[in-house]
């Protein structure tokens, strides 16, 4: 995150970038289907742009934003999970996202 001007200094964010060996539309269909998310998150889609961006709200008021871009060998998924309230929450979200992305990668690589 570039500049926290106007933000509470206690608010944290998490950034993760993952490459997938499939087209962006396939990853978009998985990320855009909240039924395929980890159950513990209880996501609600707030906004999306076809095959490129999804913004989600979670019950703790944190906000994951996924951006997809096409790469020569597939696509890149960038996650900016913003408005995280504590270092512990950020650690937990990092574990959740890394496990889910690993699961999605395994699924699309079959």
Where are these predicted regions, by residue range?
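Short, hydrophobic/aromatic-rich segments at coil-to-beta transitions
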Residues: 47-57
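Short, well-ordered beta-strand elements
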Residues: 75-82
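A conserved amphipathic terminal alpha-helix motif
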Residues: 1-3, 83-110
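Hydrophobic ligand-binding cavity/cleft-lining segments
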Residues: 1-42
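Hydrophobic/aromatic beta-strand elements that line small-molecule binding cavities or substrate pockets
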Residues: 43-45, 62-70
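Short, surface-exposed coil-to-beta transition loops
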Residues: 13-15, 60-65
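Short, surface-exposed beta-strand-loop junctions and turns on beta-sheet-rich folds
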Residues: 35, 62-63, 83-85
